[in-house]
Amino acid sequence: MQDKSIKKIVLAYSGGLDTSAIIPWLKENYGGCEVVAFVADIGQERGDLEGVEQKALQSGASECHVVDLREEFISEYVYPVLQTGALYEGTYLLGTSMARPIIAKAQVELALKVGADALCHGATGKGNDQVRFETTYTALAPQLKVVAPWREWDLRSREALLDYLKERNIPTTASLEKIYSRDENAWHISTEGGVLESPWNAPNKDCWVWTVDPLEAPDQPEQVTIAVEKGRVVAVNGEALSPFGCLDKLNAIGARHGVGRIDIVENRLVGIKSRGCYETPGGTIMVNALRAVEQLVLDRDSFKWREQLGLEMSYVVYDGRWFAPLRKSIQASAEALAEEVNGEVVLQLYKGQVTAIQKKSANSLYSEEFATFGEDEVYDHRHAGGFIRLFSLSSRIRALNEKK
């Protein structure tokens, strides 16, 4: 049931076919309401932003606001997740999941600024993004109403959307030929649909956008040096850069070596399994650099705790609960562990692989004196016997009981 009391809606606008159709649809179905378009710049293809304001206005928006969120996205969303080591279902670096809360937060801020009484997104009724957007809306501005066109309208195909715009003389560069659904930001690009809808089909070359085929990558490996401070990448090859600057540089380096490709089937929050090809070249390099420093710095219990934090964080972020107390608690714990994660790593990139070949840290717990396989004077091997007897005591008692 469409709420005719809504007077002004802020739409999360991308300039694509769906959100271009949403603007006139909102005006027609919500009593001629005013639609303000909000565009989040989170590092997507620059061409997607060219002319986006004019496109929004031509579609019927009263205003279009483009907000640069690139640095905030990497510094305040990506880096905290990196510190936990989160990988959803062991492989996915959460590129789309991390982007939705910052988009929704900035959208809410604009809505409050312009006096809107509703928020709108273009996420479908089968995906995770509707949950992520609306959970954020509720956490930050529960008084604002939410409009989700894909759960209301009867425009169910790309052809129907194109016809809808054509009937209203609204220009669009979209065409029927689009096969794949893609999501892109500074951290990653994902590809779904098309040939990927059957898990028995191998991805073709069109399923990959950023990275070269690892088999066609350079025959000579490339080394890259990463500086890490408090679990955050701060410099690449000796050049101090902002968080976005570090990622942007590593994306370019990693992409030419075919780094960061995964092809996975994941469990969506809404109960559906979906398949996607994800490319995260710079992020994959960063993850390897951080793990290399952690190997030097974190003791066994701290490393195990960090792994548990990463597992919990992966579900919190994937499920869209960024503004929940649990995420803040996990992040605080991860930041405490990361205080000592400082160092420098040299990684070798070769045909899709990333290998840490050199690493050092002022906080390293690695001691050559204790670790040597040669003769040493700092470790008394006789001490190990007592430790083993105590460590295995419960096993000894159990075995003795079984013999009674």
From Swiss-Prot:
Membrane-spanning ranges: none
The entry's keywords: Amino-acid biosynthesis, Arginine biosynthesis, ATP-binding, Cytoplasm, Ligase, Nucleotide-binding
Residues given in the record as L-aspartate binding sites: T124, N128, D129
Gene Ontology CC annotations of this record: cytoplasm
NCBIfam families: argG (TIGR00032), PRK00509.1 (NF001770)
Residues annotated as binding L-citrulline: Y92, S97, N128, R132, S181, S190, E266, Y278
Pathway connected to this protein: Amino-acid biosynthesis; L-arginine biosynthesis; L-arginine from L-ornithine and carbamoyl phosphate: step 2/3
Residues bound to ATP: A12, Y13, S14, G15, G16, L17, D18, T19, S20, A40, G122
Enzyme class: ligase
Protein's GO biological process: argininosuccinate metabolic process; L-arginine biosynthetic process; urea cycle
Oligomer and partners: Homotetramer.
Name of the protein this chain belongs to: Argininosuccinate synthase
